[in-house]
Amino acid sequence: MNRQLTRRSFVKVAGAAVGSSALLHPVPLIARGRLEKPTILGIGAGGKGKADLAGATKAGFEVIALADVVDVKKLGSITDKRTKSMAQVRDAYPQARFESDYRELMADLGDKVDAVTVSTPDHHHFHASIKAMKSGKHVYCQKPLTHGIWEARMMAKIAEETGVKTQMGNQAHANDHMRRCVELIRAGVIGKVKEIHTWTNRPIWAQGFASPPPATKVPKAIDWKQWIGPAPWVDYNPAIAPFAWRGWWNYGTGALGDMACHIMDLGYWSMNPGPPETVVAEQSGATEFSPPINSKITWEFSPNEYSSKDGFTINWYDGYVNASFNREDWKLDKVGNEYNHPSEEVLEGMDFEKFGSVIIGEHGKLFFKRSGKNAWVLKTDTHVDGFQWPEKSLPRAAGEDNYQEWYDAIQGTVSRGESHFGLAGPMTETILLGVLAQRVPGETLKWNASKMKIVGRPELGKFIRREYSPGWDSTI
């Protein structure tokens, strides 16, 4: 019998051990299969990809390959900051193999790669992550976890089936104050929860356009076919990539998809809800091509152990109140700085600037922002006088760093990253139901979670599970 283990099987052994009784009986590092430097493939090398790779290497990974649709080595002078970031990544990892197609890289490198970071536009998250997980590779994927609702369900399912270690890129999830607030809310510091309110001033990119911009010549350094990938074709224009794809239904998920995995995180995590019962959207400016200029979304959830007896709602607000799409300059023009936010009755004079959350319970409120001074504030009634402050129940991430937590999960020193796909998948699914509701404003949609259908609206199924371009199989 051959007892020799490959580096891939070492990592799989580590994950399997920690996922079971190893939690109670620590296993020596050598038995867990600790790797000196786990190897990583960076999918999406510029912009957020630069930060993800920096976080991964700081945690202890070795970058051996990069996949990006922009080959900066084919460019002359570089002025755009996102293109500059790609050049900086290539310079930082000069020995890393580079290709535009991550599928080819994964196939060619095989077991030489232990893990991947996925830092692409939203419409590539599913294919890159699923292929990696099915190949036994650990995955760190940027938010939102997926572009589509069915995709989010599948990501959580495949992560569980393969047993690889996963983490979604909502970095504040690793902050101590975030985890302490989850513990306090669950312990009842504000009583049973009735409402959650979250908001952002985004979009800060173009949304609300009625047709694509004119086609322009594709720069020689860009593999535009690979950028489009599984999504519907549109001719290249710099108004689409590298940044403004967020404002396209086919490639991004608007301000809601871009920011809710950050800002809704505290409320959703604290409540540990099942699927929402209903969702309804109010919005302004959505078109066939683009999400709205501003919106308000409300999800209704059934009662659980942390909620009031009637259940609870999550309420989302985005966008500037007085804004319009400027086609000539391909941007949003706003008048004034007022953006959608909760009522004064909710805020009670608290100003958390461009984003924030308020959790409303039967005995008080918790005001929260993701970082900075006074990151959370309690406003309670006399109920808090007899409140028993809970012991810590959630693990704390080393250095409050979600890259480090993911690395530690792979190495077997912690059981998992706390933003694992088993949590991130259902949260993303909930958020993307809100994105779907933006397409049919004013209509309360009833969600049948077991069948993944909107009750009475079969025609909306195409937005729940999208079709892919030839060559991009949904089964990978």
What residue ranges belong to the model's regions?
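Contiguous beta-strand/loop segments that form the cofactor/metal-binding neighborhood of enzyme cores
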Residues: 180, 192, 197-199, 206-423, ...
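Structural recognition of the beta-strand scaffold that forms the well-ordered cores
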Residues: 40-43, 64-68, 117-118, 140-141, ...
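Short, solvent-exposed turn/loop segments enriched in Gly/Ser/Thr/Pro and often Arg
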Residues: 99, 119-125, 145-147, 152, ...
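N-terminal glycine-/serine-/threonine-rich beta1-alpha1-beta2 phosphate-ribose binding loop
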Residues: 1-138, 153-165, 476
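Residue-level signal for alpha-helix termini/capping positions
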Residues: 107-110, 133-134, 160, 186, ...
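A contiguous active-site-proximal alpha/beta segment in oxidoreductase catalytic domains
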Residues: 138-140, 146-226
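Short, solvent-exposed loop/turn and secondary-structure capping segments
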Residues: 51-56, 76-78, 126-131, 151-152, ...
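Alpha-helical packing segments of well-folded alpha/beta enzyme cores
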Residues: 13, 52, 85, 128, ...
